[in-house]
Amino acid sequence: MVFAAIPSPSRGVVHLGPVPLRAYALMIIIGIVVAVVVTGRRLRARGMDPALAGEIAYWAVPFGIVGARIYHVLSTPDAYFGEHGHVADVVKIWNGGLGIWGAIAGGALGAWLAARRLGISLALFADAAAPGIILAQAIGRWGNWFNQELYGKPTTLPWAVRIDPAHRADPGVATYQPTFLYEFLWNLVVAAILLLVDRRHRLGRGRLFALYVALYTFGRLWIEMLRIDTADEILGLRVNIWTSAIVCVGAVVALLVVRRPVDPDVSPQEQRALGLVQDRTRRQPTDAAGETAGETRTATRHDDATDGVDVNGADVDGADPSNVNGANVNGADPVNVNVNDADGAGAGAGEQPVAGAENGAAAVSSGRTRVERPPAT
């Protein structure tokens, strides 16, 4: 006996006068908007132009939709080219039928073309976009609920989804596993993990995107095993199960093999895009003898307007000499900046190297701080 069940919508389309508004398409549109907004905010946090999210989406979305439809048609050919299929239905995407793998492949191709035109690294953009993409997928899954499609095996669980007679796989069974809900919840979990990992460990170089792919495909594996809709099989397993397994393994390999390079190996463009240009150094208070009381910390900040080094709150720019703790910086391209210590002590005996801006080196001593910048190349 079923005590409760998730009801299905009576219809998946609403007519605004003569214009039909299909819920499936509406979910996709909402997902795209969310992805663009989230990605834009993450790009801004990285010091990049948030408008890049919309510019790349302008290419990625059409390519993704076409790729999703192509994958769906190729993975379920009988529905279109079989004995009872209709070739004309290939273009009717409003009736459902978009393969997520084709969407990812097509969207990646469109994003790559856009990134080349804009002159940015696709890997850097993909890391910023990963949480937004998985959120878009979560929202898009509700389109399956409106269309009463892609549900799982029959069940009497309280959270089962009730399917109308016209859409039932078995005329005698009314409730099924709500696979759309499982994938929605899993995608939210993946989004939370990505945001947490990115906050604590800036993976970089496309590794966060690889983590997104690995986590999503891992969840898709067991969700796919619950589905009972018609699909082609290889060795007794659905094609999507094989695809999920292969892509998951590939993503894990990429996550393990691709290492974040040390700063000298990162191009200036990528440093600016990720905010790796370190241009703000803050020292801990010193004791009476001039010894450094705490470790020197370097904050990461990206600034398109300046290429200088900020030492103790003052900017050092080759084109605009500044005064740093009482020491004037003269010249168009300063290399060494000597700063008298706050207690007035002279040069100390020892120096402690710390990380500087743009791979420059800084030495903190009891008497002076020296900031060295490498010659321009």
UniProtKB/Swiss-Prot annotation:
Q: Supply one GO molecular-function term.
A: phosphatidylglycerol-prolipoprotein diacylglyceryl transferase activity
Q: Which amino acids does the record list as binding a 1,2-diacyl-sn-glycero-3-phospho-(1'-sn-glycerol)?
A: R141
Its keywords, alphabetically, are: Cell membrane, Membrane, Transferase, Transmembrane, Transmembrane helix
Metabolic or biological pathway: Protein modification; lipoprotein biosynthesis (diacylglyceryl transfer)
Q: Which GO terms describe its cellular component?
A: plasma membrane
Q: What does this protein do?
A: Catalyzes the transfer of the diacylglyceryl group from phosphatidylglycerol to the sulfhydryl group of the N-terminal cysteine of a prolipoprotein, the first step in the formation of mature lipoproteins.
Q: Which family does it belong to?
A: Belongs to the Lgt family.
| Designated name of the protein | Phosphatidylglycerol--prolipoprotein diacylglyceryl transferase
